[in-house]
From Swiss-Prot:
Chain ranges passing through the membrane: 27-51, 59-80, 102-121, 141-159, 198-220, 238-261, 274-293
Family, similarity comment: Belongs to the G-protein coupled receptor 1 family.
Ranges facing Cytoplasmic side: 52-58, 122-140, 221-237, 294-317
Gene Ontology CC, one term: plasma membrane
PANTHER family: OLFACTORY RECEPTOR
Task of the protein: Odorant receptor.
Record-given protein name: Olfactory receptor 1082
Keywords (A to Z) from UniProt: Cell membrane, Disulfide bond, G-protein coupled receptor, Glycoprotein, Membrane, Olfaction, Receptor, Sensory transduction, Transducer, Transmembrane, Transmembrane helix
Subcellular location: Cell membrane
Naturally occurring in which organism (per UniProt): Rattus norvegicus (Rat)
Cysteine pairs bridged by disulfides in the record: C98-C190
Membrane topology, Extracellular segments: 1-26, 81-101, 160-197, 262-273
Protein backbone atom coordinates (compact mmCIF):
# COMPACT_ATOMS: atom_id res chain seq x y z
CA UNK A 1 0.00 0.00 0.00
CA UNK A 2 1.25 3.44 -0.77
CA UNK A 3 2.07 5.97 1.88
CA UNK A 4 -0.70 8.42 2.41
CA UNK A 5 -3.54 6.15 1.49
CA UNK A 6 -6.71 6.54 3.53
CA UNK A 7 -7.43 4.16 6.38
CA UNK A 8 -10.39 2.88 4.37
CA UNK A 9 -7.86 1.11 2.11
CA UNK A 10 -6.59 -0.96 5.05
CA UNK A 11 -8.46 -4.14 5.86
CA UNK A 12 -6.77 -4.69 9.22
CA UNK A 13 -4.29 -3.47 11.81
CA UNK A 14 -1.67 -5.57 13.58
CA UNK A 15 -1.51 -5.63 17.39
CA UNK A 16 2.10 -6.32 18.41
CA UNK A 17 1.21 -7.06 22.05
CA UNK A 18 3.83 -7.42 24.78
CA UNK A 19 6.53 -9.51 23.17
CA UNK A 20 7.43 -11.23 19.93
CA UNK A 21 8.98 -14.17 21.80
CA UNK A 22 6.63 -17.15 21.17
CA UNK A 23 7.97 -18.98 24.25
CA UNK A 24 6.32 -16.38 26.49
CA UNK A 25 2.92 -16.53 24.79
CA UNK A 26 1.58 -19.40 26.93
CA UNK A 27 2.65 -17.64 30.14
CA UNK A 28 1.01 -14.39 29.03
CA UNK A 29 -2.16 -16.24 27.98
CA UNK A 30 -2.45 -18.07 31.32
CA UNK A 31 -1.71 -14.92 33.34
CA UNK A 32 -4.23 -12.70 31.58
CA UNK A 33 -6.91 -15.39 31.45
CA UNK A 34 -6.55 -15.80 35.23
CA UNK A 35 -6.70 -12.04 35.86
CA UNK A 36 -9.70 -11.68 33.56
CA UNK A 37 -11.64 -14.45 35.30
CA UNK A 38 -10.81 -12.99 38.73
CA UNK A 39 -11.94 -9.54 37.54
CA UNK A 40 -15.27 -10.78 36.17
CA UNK A 41 -16.01 -13.07 39.13
CA UNK A 42 -15.00 -10.49 41.76
CA UNK A 43 -17.06 -7.69 40.27
CA UNK A 44 -20.04 -9.98 39.65
CA UNK A 45 -19.98 -10.97 43.33
CA UNK A 46 -20.04 -7.29 44.32
CA UNK A 47 -23.03 -6.65 42.02
CA UNK A 48 -24.92 -9.73 43.26
CA UNK A 49 -24.23 -8.88 46.90
CA UNK A 50 -25.58 -5.35 46.45
CA UNK A 51 -28.67 -6.53 44.55
CA UNK A 52 -29.58 -9.32 47.00
CA UNK A 53 -28.87 -7.49 50.29
CA UNK A 54 -31.56 -4.89 50.99
CA UNK A 55 -29.42 -2.94 53.48
CA UNK A 56 -27.05 -2.12 50.60
CA UNK A 57 -29.80 -0.47 48.54
CA UNK A 58 -28.32 3.00 49.11
CA UNK A 59 -26.84 5.58 46.69
CA UNK A 60 -23.26 4.68 47.62
CA UNK A 61 -23.70 1.01 46.77
CA UNK A 62 -25.84 1.83 43.73
CA UNK A 63 -22.84 3.65 42.27
CA UNK A 64 -20.49 0.89 43.41
CA UNK A 65 -22.56 -1.74 41.58
CA UNK A 66 -22.41 0.39 38.45
CA UNK A 67 -18.65 0.81 38.85
CA UNK A 68 -18.29 -2.97 39.09
CA UNK A 69 -20.35 -3.36 35.91
CA UNK A 70 -18.14 -0.79 34.18
CA UNK A 71 -15.00 -2.62 35.33
CA UNK A 72 -16.27 -5.88 33.80
CA UNK A 73 -17.08 -4.19 30.49
CA UNK A 74 -13.85 -2.16 30.55
CA UNK A 75 -11.72 -5.30 30.84
CA UNK A 76 -13.91 -7.31 28.46
CA UNK A 77 -13.30 -4.74 25.73
CA UNK A 78 -9.61 -5.63 25.45
CA UNK A 79 -8.62 -8.92 27.11
CA UNK A 80 -10.81 -11.47 25.23
CA UNK A 81 -9.55 -10.25 21.84
CA UNK A 82 -5.96 -10.40 23.07
CA UNK A 83 -6.47 -13.97 24.35
CA UNK A 84 -8.00 -15.03 21.04
CA UNK A 85 -5.06 -13.54 19.13
CA UNK A 86 -2.56 -15.38 21.33
CA UNK A 87 -4.47 -18.67 21.06
CA UNK A 88 -4.81 -18.45 17.27
CA UNK A 89 -1.28 -17.00 16.90
CA UNK A 90 -2.74 -14.08 14.98
CA UNK A 91 -1.99 -10.40 15.53
CA UNK A 92 -4.53 -8.94 13.14
CA UNK A 93 -7.67 -7.01 13.98
CA UNK A 94 -9.99 -5.73 11.27
CA UNK A 95 -10.27 -2.00 10.70
CA UNK A 96 -13.92 -1.99 11.79
CA UNK A 97 -13.20 -4.05 14.93
CA UNK A 98 -10.28 -1.79 15.83
CA UNK A 99 -12.38 1.38 15.66
CA UNK A 100 -15.22 -0.33 17.54
CA UNK A 101 -12.86 -1.54 20.26
CA UNK A 102 -11.36 1.93 20.65
CA UNK A 103 -14.82 3.51 20.87
CA UNK A 104 -16.19 1.07 23.47
CA UNK A 105 -12.95 1.30 25.48
CA UNK A 106 -13.28 5.10 25.61
CA UNK A 107 -16.91 4.84 26.75
CA UNK A 108 -16.10 2.67 29.75
CA UNK A 109 -12.84 4.46 30.58
CA UNK A 110 -14.70 7.77 30.84
CA UNK A 111 -17.61 6.13 32.67
CA UNK A 112 -15.22 4.86 35.34
CA UNK A 113 -13.73 8.33 35.56
CA UNK A 114 -17.11 10.04 36.03
CA UNK A 115 -18.46 7.41 38.43
CA UNK A 116 -15.51 7.97 40.76
CA UNK A 117 -16.31 11.70 40.76
CA UNK A 118 -20.01 11.01 41.42
CA UNK A 119 -19.09 8.66 44.28
CA UNK A 120 -16.85 11.37 45.74
CA UNK A 121 -19.80 13.79 45.66
CA UNK A 122 -21.94 11.16 47.40
CA UNK A 123 -19.32 10.83 50.15
CA UNK A 124 -19.07 14.63 50.42
CA UNK A 125 -22.81 14.97 51.06
CA UNK A 126 -22.76 12.05 53.54
CA UNK A 127 -19.91 13.53 55.54
CA UNK A 128 -20.65 17.25 55.33
CA UNK A 129 -24.48 17.24 55.23
CA UNK A 130 -25.50 13.99 56.98
CA UNK A 131 -28.92 15.25 58.09
CA UNK A 132 -29.88 16.21 54.54
CA UNK A 133 -28.21 13.24 52.82
CA UNK A 134 -31.37 11.30 51.91
CA UNK A 135 -33.03 14.48 50.64
CA UNK A 136 -30.10 15.63 48.50
CA UNK A 137 -28.86 12.28 47.16
CA UNK A 138 -32.25 10.81 46.29
CA UNK A 139 -33.10 8.12 43.74
CA UNK A 140 -33.88 10.67 41.03
CA UNK A 141 -30.50 12.38 41.41
CA UNK A 142 -28.68 9.03 41.32
CA UNK A 143 -30.35 8.08 38.02
CA UNK A 144 -29.72 11.57 36.61
CA UNK A 145 -26.01 11.51 37.49
CA UNK A 146 -25.64 8.01 36.04
CA UNK A 147 -27.41 8.96 32.79
CA UNK A 148 -25.33 12.14 32.50
CA UNK A 149 -22.15 10.10 32.88
CA UNK A 150 -23.30 7.70 30.16
CA UNK A 151 -24.28 10.51 27.77
CA UNK A 152 -20.99 12.41 28.13
CA UNK A 153 -18.93 9.22 27.82
CA UNK A 154 -20.76 8.03 24.70
CA UNK A 155 -20.65 11.48 23.11
CA UNK A 156 -16.91 11.78 23.73
CA UNK A 157 -16.22 8.31 22.31
CA UNK A 158 -18.42 9.03 19.28
CA UNK A 159 -16.58 12.28 18.49
CA UNK A 160 -13.18 10.62 18.85
CA UNK A 161 -14.28 7.76 16.60
CA UNK A 162 -15.46 10.18 13.91
CA UNK A 163 -12.08 11.92 14.03
CA UNK A 164 -10.18 8.64 13.70
CA UNK A 165 -12.36 7.64 10.74
CA UNK A 166 -11.13 10.74 8.90
CA UNK A 167 -7.43 10.08 9.56
CA UNK A 168 -4.87 8.94 7.03
CA UNK A 169 -2.25 6.34 7.98
CA UNK A 170 1.17 6.00 6.39
CA UNK A 171 3.50 3.02 6.19
CA UNK A 172 3.02 0.07 8.54
CA UNK A 173 -0.26 -0.23 10.41
CA UNK A 174 1.35 -2.00 13.36
CA UNK A 175 0.08 -0.97 16.79
CA UNK A 176 2.65 -1.55 19.59
CA UNK A 177 -0.11 -2.46 22.02
CA UNK A 178 -2.46 -5.32 22.91
CA UNK A 179 -5.56 -3.32 21.92
CA UNK A 180 -6.57 -0.39 19.71
CA UNK A 181 -5.85 2.60 21.91
CA UNK A 182 -6.58 6.19 20.85
CA UNK A 183 -3.10 7.55 21.58
CA UNK A 184 -1.44 4.74 19.62
CA UNK A 185 -3.68 5.34 16.60
CA UNK A 186 -2.94 9.07 16.70
CA UNK A 187 0.80 8.30 16.58
CA UNK A 188 0.37 6.11 13.49
CA UNK A 189 -1.39 8.74 11.42
CA UNK A 190 0.35 11.02 8.94
CA UNK A 191 -2.59 13.42 8.69
CA UNK A 192 -1.43 16.98 9.33
CA UNK A 193 -4.61 18.14 11.04
CA UNK A 194 -3.79 20.11 14.19
CA UNK A 195 -7.41 20.54 15.45
CA UNK A 196 -8.02 16.78 15.19
CA UNK A 197 -4.82 15.90 17.05
CA UNK A 198 -5.61 18.54 19.68
CA UNK A 199 -9.05 17.03 20.32
CA UNK A 200 -7.69 13.47 20.38
CA UNK A 201 -4.97 14.26 22.91
CA UNK A 202 -6.35 17.14 24.96
CA UNK A 203 -10.03 16.30 25.51
CA UNK A 204 -9.44 12.99 27.40
CA UNK A 205 -6.96 14.80 29.68
CA UNK A 206 -9.44 17.63 30.26
CA UNK A 207 -12.28 15.24 31.14
CA UNK A 208 -10.03 13.37 33.58
CA UNK A 209 -8.83 16.67 35.07
CA UNK A 210 -12.40 17.93 35.58
CA UNK A 211 -13.43 14.73 37.37
CA UNK A 212 -10.25 14.66 39.44
CA UNK A 213 -10.73 18.31 40.43
CA UNK A 214 -14.24 17.48 41.62
CA UNK A 215 -12.87 14.58 43.66
CA UNK A 216 -10.15 16.78 45.19
CA UNK A 217 -12.71 19.44 46.14
CA UNK A 218 -15.03 16.84 47.67
CA UNK A 219 -12.25 15.37 49.79
CA UNK A 220 -11.01 18.81 50.80
CA UNK A 221 -14.46 19.53 52.22
CA UNK A 222 -14.64 16.04 53.78
CA UNK A 223 -11.27 16.46 55.52
CA UNK A 224 -12.35 19.89 56.79
CA UNK A 225 -15.55 18.36 58.14
CA UNK A 226 -13.70 15.46 59.79
CA UNK A 227 -11.22 17.88 61.36
CA UNK A 228 -14.08 19.64 63.15
CA UNK A 229 -15.21 16.38 64.83
CA UNK A 230 -14.06 16.40 68.45
CA UNK A 231 -13.74 12.67 69.21
CA UNK A 232 -11.14 10.32 67.74
CA UNK A 233 -13.77 7.61 67.32
CA UNK A 234 -15.99 10.01 65.38
CA UNK A 235 -13.12 11.00 63.10
CA UNK A 236 -12.24 7.36 62.44
CA UNK A 237 -15.86 6.45 61.65
CA UNK A 238 -16.23 9.40 59.26
CA UNK A 239 -12.96 8.62 57.46
CA UNK A 240 -13.65 4.88 57.24
CA UNK A 241 -16.70 5.53 55.05
CA UNK A 242 -14.39 7.13 52.46
CA UNK A 243 -11.34 4.86 52.76
CA UNK A 244 -12.33 2.32 50.10
CA UNK A 245 -13.30 4.96 47.56
CA UNK A 246 -10.12 6.93 48.24
CA UNK A 247 -8.02 3.80 47.67
CA UNK A 248 -9.71 3.12 44.32
CA UNK A 249 -9.34 6.77 43.25
CA UNK A 250 -5.63 6.70 44.09
CA UNK A 251 -5.14 3.46 42.15
CA UNK A 252 -7.19 4.60 39.13
CA UNK A 253 -5.55 7.99 38.63
CA UNK A 254 -1.99 6.98 39.56
CA UNK A 255 -2.01 4.11 37.04
CA UNK A 256 -3.69 6.31 34.42
CA UNK A 257 -1.05 9.00 34.93
CA UNK A 258 1.66 6.34 34.72
CA UNK A 259 0.34 5.17 31.34
CA UNK A 260 0.16 8.75 30.04
CA UNK A 261 3.70 9.61 31.15
CA UNK A 262 5.25 6.33 29.96
CA UNK A 263 3.68 6.63 26.50
CA UNK A 264 5.00 10.18 26.19
CA UNK A 265 8.53 9.54 27.52
CA UNK A 266 9.55 5.93 26.87
CA UNK A 267 10.17 4.98 23.24
CA UNK A 268 10.23 1.18 23.58
CA UNK A 269 7.80 -0.49 21.17
CA UNK A 270 6.16 -2.58 23.93
CA UNK A 271 6.50 -0.13 26.85
CA UNK A 272 3.04 1.41 26.39
CA UNK A 273 1.39 -2.02 26.40
CA UNK A 274 3.22 -3.09 29.56
CA UNK A 275 2.38 0.17 31.35
CA UNK A 276 -1.30 -0.10 30.38
CA UNK A 277 -1.69 -3.44 32.17
CA UNK A 278 -1.97 -1.72 35.57
CA UNK A 279 -4.64 0.66 34.28
CA UNK A 280 -6.71 -1.67 32.11
CA UNK A 281 -6.40 -5.02 33.91
CA UNK A 282 -4.98 -4.78 37.43
CA UNK A 283 -7.10 -1.86 38.67
CA UNK A 284 -10.49 -3.42 37.72
CA UNK A 285 -9.29 -6.70 39.24
CA UNK A 286 -8.30 -5.11 42.57
CA UNK A 287 -11.39 -2.91 43.03
CA UNK A 288 -13.63 -5.71 44.44
CA UNK A 289 -10.89 -6.76 46.87
CA UNK A 290 -10.40 -3.18 48.07
CA UNK A 291 -14.11 -2.76 48.80
CA UNK A 292 -14.59 -6.21 50.32
CA UNK A 293 -11.55 -5.91 52.59
CA UNK A 294 -12.01 -2.29 53.71
CA UNK A 295 -15.81 -2.09 53.83
CA UNK A 296 -17.53 -4.12 56.56
CA UNK A 297 -20.99 -3.88 54.96
CA UNK A 298 -19.77 -5.29 51.64
CA UNK A 299 -17.71 -7.95 53.39
CA UNK A 300 -20.74 -9.04 55.43
CA UNK A 301 -22.97 -9.05 52.34
CA UNK A 302 -20.49 -11.21 50.42
CA UNK A 303 -20.31 -13.66 53.33
CA UNK A 304 -24.12 -13.94 53.41
CA UNK A 305 -24.24 -14.37 49.63
CA UNK A 306 -21.65 -17.15 49.67
CA UNK A 307 -23.29 -18.82 52.69
CA UNK A 308 -26.64 -18.75 50.88
CA UNK A 309 -25.11 -20.35 47.79
CA UNK A 310 -23.51 -23.06 49.93
CA UNK A 311 -26.87 -23.85 51.57
CA UNK A 312 -28.61 -24.04 48.18
CA UNK A 313 -25.88 -26.34 46.88
CA UNK A 314 -26.19 -28.50 50.02
CA UNK A 315 -29.98 -28.90 49.66
CA UNK A 316 -29.89 -29.52 45.91
CA UNK A 317 -26.99 -31.94 46.34
Amino acid sequence: MESGNSTRRFSSFFLLGFTENPQLHFLIFALFLSMYLVTVLGNLLIIMAIITQSHLHTPMYFFLANLSFVDICFTSTTIPKMLVNIYTQSKSITYEDCISQMCVFLVFAELGNFLLAVMAYDRYVAXCHPLCYTVIVNHRLCILLLLLSWVISIFHAFIQSLIVLQLTFCGDVKIPHFFCELNQLSQLTCSDNFPSHLIMNLVPVMLAAISFSGILYSYFKIVSSIHSISTVQGKYKAFSTCASHLSIVSLFYSTGLGVYVSSAVVQSSHSAASASVMYTVVTPMLNPFIYSLRNKDVKRALERLLEGNCKVHHWTG
